[in-house]
Amino acid sequence: MHDRILDFWFEEIEPVMWFKKDEDFDRLLHTRFGHIWQAAAAGELAGWRATVEGRLAEVIVLDQFSRNLFRGTPRSFSCDGMALILAQEAIRSGECERLSREQRGFLYLPFMHSESALIHRQALQLYTELNNGDQLDFELRHKAIIDRFGRYPHRNAILGRVSTPEEEEFLRQPGSGF
């Protein structure tokens, strides 16, 4: 089953869709994989963790699919902690070295999505070692926001958090959100 996720993500769709806001794509994910997201969110895909590929697929479902399925709602971030733990375990095991650079970039995304400065220091090391300029650049941009605010201000409204005046000013700047 996890092969379906990886085939879809890395073979079937174009990379431009990975981070694009597209309602049709979000609906497609919901139709094809909504039930898998539900199982992953409930912790029911533990069997996938027997291989690094299965773990990567579960991370993609929890981290990336959540953002598409529940765009603009608190649920879009609801599985970030679980995805981060799975990614940390895969890295600790050393098995992630078997993945392609592109796949490892997605395994590392829960680090980039974290609002922890400590986790971002680890993310910076991971993306530096990965040696993919675009992904490293994105991590540097994410880390700068966490270093400055301790959180992602663009999530404040979604999560019901009050923005500080400095965050409000930042949010008015072009490119302040992801």
Give the ranges of each region predicted by the language model.
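Intrinsically disordered, low-complexity activation-like regions
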Residues: 1-57, 61-72, 77-178
